[in-house]
Amino acid sequence: MFRESDNTIAPSNQDLNKPVVDKEQPAERTPFFVDKNAPHNEVDFARIESAVREILEAVGEDPDRDGLLETPERVARMYAEMFAGLKSDPGRHLAKVFAEDYDEIVLVRDISFCSMCEHHLLPFTGKAHIAYLPSGKVVGLSKLARVVEEVARRPQVQERLTHTVANLIEDRLSARGVAVVVESTHSCMTMRGIRKPGSLCLTSAMRGAFKTDPKSRAEVLGLINRAAS
């Protein structure tokens, strides 16, 4: 029933030669290098750099010493990269789909990501597991990972990230069922405050059959738990 590799469980007869929708341009790769001089860049680098200098001075540091001289610029580039998903539409990665007479679970597991907690602006990192029940069309498996990557690049809480990914897949693929399980470690719990390294936050979002049918829910959670073990 399934073709299984290191990262996916998917239909073995998936035919990528029968496009149903291909009206948009090929999806762009999520940028990891940020050009602060690019005319389309909406990040105010100067304001971030000024704010970082203020923070350094406020904690008693000298922002003009050798080790910190370029830190404000580095931090500005980092924020531009980490928050690149704010102005983008991650759903565009799901625009191209393929006709496929397959109605069982498609699961992509262990999609690594890094996002930023909106409460302390500290990173949380982990893995997402995505499953869906197709309704006559499937999407390229890598596109699910691109959705996670792009949704992650914004300040947020893990709960919102989980629901955003689930809603996108349900809406854009008209999936009969969607399950998204996210597990991550939060820096705001491990390096400050309660300081509990190793603690793990687990969130889930169920849609369609995975939410309403106990048997379908149990099946997909069993596959995800096997994948995560």
From Swiss-Prot:
Q: Name one Pfam family in it.
A: GTP_cyclohydroI
List its EC numbers. 3.5.4.16
Task: State the UniProt keywords alphabetically.
Answer: GTP-binding, Hydrolase, Metal-binding, Nucleotide-binding, One-carbon metabolism, Zinc
Give me any GO biological process, just one: tetrahydrobiopterin biosynthetic process
Composition skew (Polar residues), residue ranges: 7-16
Pathway assignment reads: Cofactor biosynthesis; 7,8-dihydroneopterin triphosphate biosynthesis; 7,8-dihydroneopterin triphosphate from GTP: step 1/1
Write down the Gene3D superfamilies for this protein, in alphabetical order: 1.10.286.10, 3.30.1130.10
Q: What class of enzyme is it?
A: hydrolase
Q: Where does Zn(2+) bind?
A: C117, H120, C188
- Annotated stretches, region: Disordered: 1-31
Q: How does it assemble?
A: Toroid-shaped homodecamer, composed of two pentamers of five dimers.
Q: Which family does it belong to?
A: Belongs to the GTP cyclohydrolase I family.
By what name is this protein known?
GTP cyclohydrolase 1
Organism for this UniProt entry: Rhodopirellula baltica (strain DSM 10527 / NCIMB 13988 / SH1)
